[in-house]
Amino acid sequence: DNLNNRVELRDYQIDAFQNFITYYNSEGLHKNKQIHTLLHMATGSGKTLIMAGLILYLYKSGYRNFLFFVNMTNIVEKTKENFMNRLSSKYLFAETIEIDGDIVDIREVDNFQNTNENDINICFSTTQKLHFDLSVPQENSLTIEDFEDKKIVLISDESHHVNTLTKKGKDDIAEEQSWEYSVNRVFTANRDNIMLEFTATCDLKDP
């Protein structure tokens, strides 16, 4: 109901939502582990729409803080347009978002330290910037404490890039210096953190 009214869900998008909701609500499926999903969707199939729908669903489930990160800055900017710019033809949310009788605003934040618990708070970053912010803490940037103190939904687009360093087997790169280490560190900082990974190019033989 809170997606843009010009958006018409395709059958496979409805299936994706239903599959996630089933997984989210079934402890037997995620076996008492943190929720971590990978959605394999082709380019142009509406990945960002699924992200928007899951943000709304998880807000209703008690989540307020969302980190979107990707390998390339231009994708960050395109996603901001989809999520934040109400004047854009590609804006994905309804003009007014109402959840459980309350009007909900979407806000872009730099960190999660002083977020409004009534809003959808989204921090946009690149994988490189996330790694740098955690390695070299600075004022107003993300810190590991953000992920320890509040439950965060991590949304990773083209997540296979996160694993690049590890999969190439570059032994000379210390694990502590890799992007993958930083992502796993923030994901596991709080047991309630959720990881939603999206990719168009998953190697199903070696996922």
Spans of model-derived segments:
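Walker A/P-loop
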Residues: 30-54
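Conserved H-loop
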Residues: 44, 70-71, 200
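Conserved Walker A/P-loop ATP-binding site and its immediately adjacent core
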Residues: 50, 62-92, 129
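Alpha-helical scaffold elements adjacent to nucleotide-binding pockets in ATP/GTP-utilizing enzyme cores
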Residues: 15-20, 50-54, 75-86, 123, ...
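Signature of the SF2 helicase/ATPase Hel1-core->accessory helical subdomain module
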Residues: 56, 81, 127-207
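Short helix/loop segment immediately N-terminal to the Walker
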Residues: 26-39, 136, 141-143
